[in-house]
Regions:
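ASCE RecA-like P-loop NTPase motor cores
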Residues: 1-256
């Protein structure tokens, strides 16, 4: 039996319709769903998520459990709508070793949530939730959005990157860096898996692309890009608007 056939069987189960009615009832704040084991919980979740009525946040017991659950959902739904929200630390928080890749994943989740995309599903675990995040307002102030065809001064973009504490380098190879070569700005946002290449023609953005770090070759054309700095940098010292991740979520989010 294929994954598609399994999902179709779950979709036709009478309890799915009952669950959807419960999720749509705003007067109900808590309910219990039991009797699931192994990957059956992922299958059930994938059917509910596919309705795209609410954002979902699944809180697993630890990193390993969250990783397995995330992998199952990606196999069922694809990568576009399923996001992973890890701890920003490589090991336990007490060791203080930040992981740039994890920080990218965390920032991407916040950026996607702020856009209020329908059908988002986020998988996380307690260690990740223990770390506070910036507020919606703080994130908005620390976000630069650029679109192909925008009329914007190249120096303005450079000034914003400096203000965001991006590091000027010859070649971009890790998040938080930018480089300038002629009419091109390369920048590695903390909200993207790949760095961006912004090509100007005078005061107009002629093209936006992602590129590979190792080869420095262009990868994919984009209509728009979102540039976000390291949101944790300096906030603890400045007393920035740090809040719980759960407070960042919209009121219609389903926690499971």
């Amino acid at each position: 039996m294929t994954i598609t056939q399994l999902r179709q069987r779950y979709e036709k189960h009478p309890n799915i319709e009952a669950l959807n009615r419960i999720l749509d009832d705003t007067t109900l704040k808590h309910f219990y769903c039991g009797g699931l084991s192994a990957s059956s919980s992922s299958l059930l979740a994938s059917v509910l998520i596919s309705k795209e009525k609410h954002p979902f946040v699944f809180i697993l017991g630890n990193l390993e459990e969250a990783g397995y659950f995330y992998h199952d959902l990606v196999q069922l739904l694809g990568e576009e709508k399923v996001l992973f929200f890890p701890s920003s630390f490589r090991r336990a928080i007490k060791y203080g070793q930040k992981d740039a890749a994890n920080e990218i994943l965390r920032t991407e989740v916040l950026s996607r949530l702020q856009k209020q995309e329908k059908g988002l599903c986020i998988v996380t675990y307690p260690d990740a939730l223990a770390e506070k995040v910036v507020s919606q307002q703080e994130l908005q102030e620390k976000t630069l959005k650029l679109f192909q065809g925008d009329r914007v001064d190249m120096q303005f973009v450079v000034d914003v990157l400096r203000e965001f504490n991006f590091e000027f380098v010859d070649y971009v190879y890790e998040p938080g860096q930018y480089a300038v070569r002629g009419s091109i700005i390369d920048v590695f946002s903390f909200s993207s898996e790949y760095p961006y290449r912004i090509d100007f023609f005078g005061d107009e953005i002629e093209s936006l692309r992602t590129f590979e770090v190792q080869s420095q070759l262009s990868k994919e054309k984009r209509n728009d890009v979102v540039i976000v700095p390291d949101l944790s940098r300096g906030l603890s010292k400045q007393g920035g608007n740090l809040i719980s991740f759960l407070d960042f979520l919209s009121a219609d989010t389903i926690l499971a």
